[in-house]
């Protein structure tokens, strides 16, 4: 059994080797056929005698090759595995040697051709005389090489005998004489298949190499070019000759080497031939190829330099502009100190007086921030400010709304001491504090400076207590009594202004916010605009601060007085800016007047109106005389009631028209309370409050989101997915 298996294995391996040999032999036969087809064509004018002889030689060669192949196949079939392996190794070594020899020959020929092309151009006569002995020598050399390789390679090719070459020379010479075409001065040697290793190539006929090298002489330049094999001759025409096909290297790619025909008329005029040198495009006759190549290189160098210069001109760097440096801190403080004067230039005398009071309070507040600790024990106002600043801190990061309405905690002793002092000593202490402002606000201590702007600070002397409830007695008092009390308060304030006149400050650089119509300095407008939501922002700030004030005032009997009432708030009824301390009184007066006008329904109610700031002063004076225990304010409730009652009121006039509601001075109060101003109250639109703009989710009709059905829809989809997964 084991012997039979070995025999079977040997038989299978022998079959595989036979198949491989058949494939290799078929490839070799195909190559040989291609070589036969790609033989060098020799042009002659004979009647075809040479072609018949060549065809006979080719047939005999093919028959011999086929016989040798059959014998080799039979031998391989009878060989053992070891013999087949040894034969395969020998064949591979022979092929490698042939390839190496061929590559070396090609390199040598290339070197020689390049050297000769660079030296000089041979004349056609000299090339004709040298062609015949070179052909004889190279043909004998090729015969010797073929005899050496006959034992190792299959299908040895024989070259064309010299008799054919001679015949072709004679026939070509005769034909050239008849045609009289000026291709070369030497008419006897137009086409000669010569093999040589030296000579210059032109672009018209470049050499192509093959295993068996057959070389022909190029008629145009007189140089030598290498070709593969001789083929069928073709009859020559008047335009060109010598179609020479070759196969380059091992790639088996054919190429035609065609001579470029020159212009016959130009040649006749000049009397010479135009030579094209190897490697140089269109080098004219009589010019050194080396010099011509140098000219081309110089042109390329100039072009490259000009291109670089053009690119450098296109790319230009832009210079950096001047740096944007921040302003020094003392300029910012001057702007903050001057921001209130120019904004109120064109307003009345009462507004100017209010601005002066605001500037006084602002200076006193700014001086408290930077005063020393020794001064806090001397003055009760200083100690009160220190306590307030230590206790109170902003609760949010907003630049404008975080410093809204808030109430500070202070002790009852500070409250009593501040109430016990008259207005004159208070102003004197404020003036003493403001005298130190120039020493405190120095640019050296810019890291510790805090710029104070009136729109972002609260009134410490006259705080707005939103949670306190108005007593019924104060609401029942007639407006005439309030007017009388307000006159006294205004007189006291005028005396204070005369004693301590504040410095003149300009506010020409103030910028108004387009959303909330409030004026801010340039240093604060950007920070405010980032978080400003219009009128809704003020309402949210009021409600939030009202909760904080309610929590802080639970354990206190009365609200403390603040140090300043510098901030202005906008009244939603008359659309006018009111000082923060007088805001609540002003709103209540506006509501009462609107209610009276609505109930009467007559525009001619001749009840004299009180100016907004005067009404605020009267109400504040009356409320200070009452008990401090009423801490529940009713501003929001009154606003809501007035909105629900007046749903059909017409839209109010523009802000510029309603602005006449503010009076120039307290001396001209009667003129402000005219019929025209009362008629504007009847046209007030109370529906513009931010509270009314809020719409609950249940009443939203234009919303794209269905708040009621969204949760049910999600539950259905989840249950459906679960069922699908279970199934």
UniProtKB/Swiss-Prot annotation:
Keywords: Chromatin regulator, DNA damage, DNA repair, Isopeptide bond, Metal-binding, Nucleus, Phosphoprotein, Repeat, Transcription, Transcription regulation, Ubl conjugation, Zinc, Zinc-finger. Residues 60-70 have a biased composition (Basic residues). Residues 80-99, 104-124 form the UIM domain. The modification Phosphoserine is found at residues 29, 44, 46, 140, 205, 379, 402, 474, 637, 665, 689. A zinc finger (UBZ4-type) spans 510-537. Sumoylated. Zn(2+) binds at residues 513, 516, 528, 532. Residues 195-206 have a biased composition (Low complexity). Residues 97-103 are annotated as: UIM-linker. The modification Phosphothreonine is found at residue 51. Residues 100-200 are annotated as: Necessary for interaction with NR6A1 N-terminus. Residues 513-590 are annotated as: Zinc-finger-like region. Its main location: nucleus. One of its GO terms (biological process) is regulation of DNA repair. One of its GO terms (cellular component) is nucleus. There is a cross-link at residues 20, 31, 75, 90, 245, 382, 387, 436, 552, 570, 595, 617, 652, 708 (Glycyl lysine isopeptide (Lys-Gly) (interchain with G-Cter in SUMO2)). Residues 400-508 are annotated as: Necessary for interaction with NR6A1 C-terminus. The tandem UIM domains form a continuous 60 Angstrom-long alpha-helix and mediate binding to 'Lys-63'-linked ubiquitins. UIM1 and UIM2 bind to the proximal and distal ubiquitin moieties and recognize an 'Ile-44'-centered hydrophobic patch. Since UIMs don't interact with the 'Lys-63' isopeptide bond the UIM-linker region between the 2 UIM domains determines the selectivity for 'Lys-63'-linkage, and its length is very important for specificity. The Abraxas-interacting region (AIR) mediates the interaction with ABRAXAS1. Component of the ARISC complex, at least composed of UIMC1/RAP80, ABRAXAS1, BRCC3/BRCC36, BABAM2 and BABAM1/NBA1. Component of the BRCA1-A complex, at least composed of the BRCA1, BARD1, UIMC1/RAP80, ABRAXAS1, BRCC3/BRCC36, BABAM2 and BABAM1/NBA1. In the BRCA1-A complex, interacts directly with ABRAXAS1. Interacts with ESR1. Interacts with UBE2I. Interacts with NR6A1. Interacts with TSP57. Interacts with TRAIP. This is BRCA1-A complex subunit RAP80. It comes from Mus musculus.
